[in-house]
């Protein structure tokens, strides 16, 4: 089953090693059947503690889709890359948002706010009923 993954990589800070290792990671992804590869460079930062005698590192986030069976083989390939200090691969969960619930909740909050304003000011502001608001939202 194809899943969407998000991986964070920490490379050595040297420019040449970083570029070479990043290309090696991308080639490995393609080799193991990854699709929709999106790469984002986060930046170079000082590390809180030395990792493999390195005080600085470059962070890269790569999103990709891959079969779950190929992931273990890909991880074993990552362990062989010397200038890769750390990595973390997470399954990216995509959830659908129920907009009807949001509209209802927003209407209730709107109605509650108007009721509070009516109590404070003493004047009456008309609030549409839920069926009237549904008609308005459909238009």
Curated annotation (Swiss-Prot):
Pfam families referenced in this protein's UniProt entry, alphabetically: Ribosomal_S6
Gene Ontology molecular function terms on file: rRNA binding; structural constituent of ribosome
CDD domains xrefs: bS6
Keywords tagged on the record: Ribonucleoprotein, Ribosomal protein, RNA-binding, rRNA-binding
GO biological process: translation
Gene source species: Borreliella afzelii (strain PKo) (Borrelia afzelii)
Similarity field: Belongs to the bacterial ribosomal protein bS6 family.
The name this protein goes by in its record: Small ribosomal subunit protein bS6
Protein role: Binds together with bS18 to 16S ribosomal RNA.
GO cellular component assignments: ribonucleoprotein complex; ribosome
SUPFAM superfamilies hit by this protein: Ribosomal protein S6 (SSF54995)
């Amino acid at each position: 089953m194809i899943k969407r993954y998000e991986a964070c990589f920490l490379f050595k800070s040297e420019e040449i090693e970083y570029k070479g290792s990043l290309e090696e990671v991308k080639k490995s992804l393609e080799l193991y059947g990854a699709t929709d590869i999106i790469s984002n460079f986060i930046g170079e930062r000082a590390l809180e503690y030395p990792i493999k005698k390195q005080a600085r590192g470059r962070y890269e986030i790569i999103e990709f889709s891959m079969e779950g069976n190929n992931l273990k083989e890909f991880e074993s390939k990552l362990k062989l890359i010397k200038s890769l200090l750390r990595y973390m691969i997470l399954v990216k969960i995509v959830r659908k948002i129920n907009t009807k619930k949001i509209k209802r909740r927003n209407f209730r909050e709107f109605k509650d706010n108007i009721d509070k304003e009516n109590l404070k000011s003493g004047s009456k502001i008309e609030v549409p009923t839920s069926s009237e608001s549904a008609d308005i939202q459909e238009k």
